[in-house]
UniProtKB/Swiss-Prot annotation:
Keywords: Repeat. Residues 489-564 are annotated as: Type E motif. It holds the Pfam family PPR_2. GO terms for molecular function: RNA binding. The keyword Ligase does not apply. This is Putative pentatricopeptide repeat-containing protein At3g05240. The gene is PCMP-E82. NCBIfam families: PPR.
Length: 565
């Protein structure tokens, strides 16, 4: 009788398209006593944990808790559901509960648990799961081993990932793909390319995902030579310059190639390929707009943005970040306000990354009031958001406003400043000549928050003291600090010498920095400028001859804070 009832219900479950329908079927199961049968219940949980239209993990959990002895299949359904959810930590809780109640995981359980570990970057839990995988003999399973490899790579443990890869019985395209993707995500681009070559020598053909990862690698390390080789490789597989192959147009590969050329600075080829695309996605538009923006061609980036809007394509977060960057390059506050107004209409103004970009844009264009207003509109202000606005204001000449924001951050108490926050604060103090305040903040780092100053923090303090002409304190700090002085430290001292015409200290620094070429051209230039102002032309000549003989090129210098933006 029960079997007679649940077969039609199973059939109806297959056709279920909404949570309302699922609730109705659940009620029918209770009414017809089918609720006691584990088969329809397991299917009900499946629909609550896998189907987008009926996804409801709370509902699935209530059904799960009504089952006296859930099977491993049902445990797996719950773990899978949570591993794919915004709360993957609950998948680990279910896994632990499963073990506690004496159930034995199978080769479906481990991949779901390892996926949760990957999402959480929980290497400690993942290592424990690895141990249990070995204990139960599932390390020989290809699917489980590949998930272990992926987990270690996601957690940044590349060497452990390599060991897992080497122990995989048979290296198929999925295993190679996980290895190459792991290398790329951990910025080991040459290793990714070498792995591809080894894969080819093993007779395994690359799939679309692998080719995309390799193009990403070439773009990130700006290796256009290898990128062009991969472009030719794709053409050898049947793709012409317009990506039309025997199986049709591949928009993903096309976009990846455009992105690679743009990141390598070859905008001409990137645009040629973009114009030749028979169809474009938002990602395609973002690639070309971002390419122009990152390469300093703000006008073309904004033109492409307007073209995209004319075609009725709605921008996303990536689009806005690129356009805001382009507006910042243009240095026009009015243009920035227009973009800000458009961002507000779309609802992206609540996104922390976009608000931080707007703040930096306004700060750079000299509009400190608009920068502060944009920041005020952000509902949730975490440490990163506070830090970005502080550094944005400080690095663009609005030191007092930066310190005012920092004071509010401390008063609110809902975010704790970190080392980068204090770098912005010290930079602000340096540029408005607040010596005592700078010393107080420098001490506060360690005393209140347990933050050990880095060479960048020491550089800011040396700059503060040197600008104020307090050279004895600056020298004492350089001699007693626990880190080796770098170009920023010596540069800060020499900058103070330049301001206050301190030739005695300049000579001492020149003798202390035995090989200034190791620190770059900036030290040479500062020394030369100081001696030129003092009319010591013989010293200027010696320095310039030294630069020429040692082939030191004159380049523009930037502070450690300025290079962050």
């Amino acid at each position: 009788m029960m079997k007679k009832h649940y077969k039609p219900i199973l059939s109806q479950l297959e056709n279920c398209r909404s949570l309302v329908e699922l609730n109705q079927l659940h009620g029918l199961m209770i009414k017809s006593s089918v609720i006691r049968n584990v088969i329809p219940l397991s299917r009900l949980i499946d629909f609550c944990t896998t189907c987008p239209e009926t996804m409801n993990l709370s509902y699935a959990r209530s059904v799960f808790e009504s089952i006296d002895c859930p099977s491993v299949y049902i445990w797996n359904s719950m773990i899978r559901g949570y591993s794919n959810s915004p709360n993957p930590d609950k998948a680990l809780i279910f896994y632990q509960e499963m073990l506690r109640k004496g159930y034995s995981p199978d080769y479906f359980t481990f991949p779901y648990v390892l996926k949760a570990c990957s999402g959480l970057r929980d290497i400690q839990f993942g290592s424990c799961v690895h141990g249990f995988v070995v204990k139960t003999g599932f390390e020989v399973n290809m699917y489980v081993s590949t998930c272990l490899l992926h987990m270690y790579m996601c957690c940044g443990e590349v060497n452990y990932g390599l060991r897992v890869f080497e122990d995989i019985p048979q290296w198929n395209v999925v295993a190679w793909g996980s290895l190459i993707s792991g290398f790329v995500n951990n910025n080991r681009f040459s290793d990714a390319i070498e792995a591809f070559r080894e894969m080819q020598s093993n007779g395994v053909k690359a799939n679309e995902t692998i080719m995309v990862d390799l193009l990403v690698a070439c773009g990130r390390c700006k290796d256009i030579v290898t990128g062009k080789w991969f472009h030719g490789f794709l053409q050898g597989l049947g793709f012409d310059p317009y990506f039309q192959s025997k199986v049709g147009f591949n928009v993903i590969l096309a976009t990846s190639l455009i992105d690679m050329y743009a990141k390598c600075g070859d905008l001409r080829t990137a645009r040629y390929l973009f114009d030749g695309m028979p169809e474009r996605t938002l990602v395609s538009w973002n690639s070309i707009i971002t390419g122009y923006s990152q390469n300093g061609d703000a006008e073309e980036a904004l033109c492409m943005f307007l073209d995209m809007l004319d075609l009725g394509i709605a921008p996303d977060k990536v689009t806005f970040l690129s356009v805001i960057r382009a507006s910042m390059i243009q240095g026009c506050s009015q243009l920035g306000q227009s973009i800000h107004a458009y961002v507000s209409k779309t609802g992206f103004v609540k996104d922390a990354a976009i608000v931080c970009a707007l703040v930096n844009m306004y700060a750079k264009t000299g509009d400190a009031e608009s920068a502060k207003k944009a920041f005020e509109d952000l509902e949730k202000k975490d440490t990163i958001a506070w830090t970005v606005v502080i550094i944005g204001l400080a690095s663009h000449g609005h030191g007092n406003e930066a310190l005012s924001i920092f004071q509010r951050m401390q008063e609110k108490g809902n975010a704790t400043p970190d080392g980068i926050t204090y770098l912005g604060v010290l930079y602000a103090c340096s540029h408005i000549g607040l010596v005592e305040e700078g010393q107080r903040y420098f001490a506060e780092m360690r005393d209140l928050h347990g933050l050990e100053p880095t060479v960048e923090h020491y550089g800011c303090m040396v700059d503060i003291l040197s600008r104020a002409g307090r050279f004895e304190e600056a020298e004492r700090l350089v001699k007693t600090m626990p880190v080796k002085p770098n170009v920023n430290i010596w540069g800060a001292l020499l900058n103070g010498c330049d301001i206050h015409e301190n030739l005695e200290l300049t000579d001492r620094i020149r003798s202390m920095v035995a090989e200034p070429e190791e620190l770059g051209s900036g030290i040479y230039v500062l020394l030369s400028n100081i001696y030129a102002k003092a009319g010591r032309w013989a010293d200027v000549k010696l320095i310039r001859e030294s630069m020429k003989s040692k082939r030191v090129d004159k380049v523009l210098g930037h502070s450690s804070v300025e290079t962050m933006f």
